[in-house]
Regions:
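Hydrophobic alpha-helical membrane-embedded segments
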Residues: 11, 42-64, 142-167, 240-252
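Divalent-cation
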Residues: 1-78, 84
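Select subsegments of transmembrane alpha-helices in polytopic membrane proteins
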Residues: 99-117, 198-209
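Cytosolic juxtamembrane amphipathic/interface segments immediately preceding
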Residues: 35-41, 86-102, 188-194
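Hydrophobic transmembrane alpha-helix segments characteristic of membrane transport
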Residues: 70-97, 102, 115-135
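Residue-level signature of transmembrane alpha-helical entry/exit and packing/kink sites
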Residues: 98, 102, 106, 138-146, ...
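Polar-ligand-bearing catalytic/cofactor-coordination segments
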Residues: 2, 6, 77-81, 132, ...
Length: 306
């Protein structure tokens, strides 16, 4: 996980700091799960598509990162005598295994996330129904429990050395974006002094999802516990879509109210981003430059500032 992924429209780049300390950059095309632009750009729906695509791209990126640390094992296999046909079959088999593993990991990740961050808070909140009669209060309590579990999880894994490095690369990603969005050349020195906090962040998105879910779940008024669970699951895509629209608005607006509502997400980034070192910043710069010609963009911002 020694790298940074940057996406610009239908192109994305993955820059990795290899074990030999060289930076390797891979640029790929990603058209998305829905190719019809009218459907892809529909409010709410675009947030659902973006969320799913982020999961898929995330798994592809992690698989690519891991490949650099499996090179020695692969090299040993290549030393074994094989015919060209046997090698081709072996590569096809490994590709199928990789795709199956990636698909299984995505499904498992979604199931675990729903179980821990959606279902567990719901069932814990039902324990208070004997002493709290208001369904509004129970729904609010469920949301508070969900936030505590989520923030606790983020804080706990930040204690792990490897995850801390992931958070440092996350910081490098934000600092690179902030650097060019503030009209500065994309250099190590400029990136270093840029902020590691950014409104359009996946961390902020997840927190907004938690907060928006409180509002939606307050209006679920059915007696059947099973039906309440089913309705929560069905509302997840809608909640993700609404949350995406807010994050999109926050990234484009300097409105005082929007800035205030964005604060919790920025505070949470205090946990999910750390100050990167210069080598990490170099990786971030390589990733940006692979998919985005930042110089004309920076020039335009400078003209607007005059």
């Amino acid at each position: 996980m020694e790298g940074v992924m940057m996406k610009n429209q239908e192109k994305y780049a993955v820059a990795v700091r290899k074990p030999d300390h060289e930076i390797e950059v891979k640029v790929s095309e990603y058209t998305g799960i829905i190719r019809n632009k009218k459907i892809r750009n529909m409010p709410i729906l675009r947030g659902v598509f973006s969320f799913i695509e982020s999961l898929v791209l995330g798994m592809q990126t992690l698989t690519y990162y891991a490949s650099f640390f499996e090179d020695e094992e692969v090299d040993e296999k290549k030393k074994e005598p094989m015919t060209e046909e046997e090698r081709r079959r072996q590569e096809q088999k490994e590709k199928k295994q990789e795709n199956a593993m990636m698909g299984g990991t995505v499904v498992l990740s979604i199931v675990l996330a729903v179980a821990v961050f959606m279902m567990l808070p719901y069932y814990l909140s039902t324990l208070f129904q004997k002493v709290i009669t208001s369904q509004w209060v129970i729904a609010l309590l469920e949301g508070v429990i969900r936030l505590v579990i989520f923030i606790g999880y983020v804080a706990l894994i930040s204690l792990m050395k490897d995850i801390r490095r992931v958070y440092m690369y996350h910081g490098a990603e934000h600092k690179c974006i902030n650097c060019i969005e503030h009209g500065m050349d994309l250099t190590v020195d400029n990136v270093r002094k840029s902020s590691r906090f950014h409104k359009r962040c996946g961390t902020s998105f997840l927190l907004i999802v938690m907060l928006v879910s409180i509002l939606f779940f307050m209006f679920i008024r059915v007696d059947s516990p099973i039906l309440r669970v089913v309705l929560r699951l069905l509302l997840i895509p809608v909640i993700a879509g609404v949350s995406y629209e807010f994050i999109r608005l926050a990234g484009r607006s300097d409105n005082a109210v929007v800035n205030l509502l964005s604060k919790p997400g920025l505070w949470l980034q205090g946990l999910t981003t750390k100050e990167p070192d210069d080598e990490m910043i170099e990786v971030g710069i390589a990733s940006v430059e692979a998919v985005f010609d930042w110089k004309p963009y920076v020039e335009e911002i400078r003209r607007e500032m005059k």
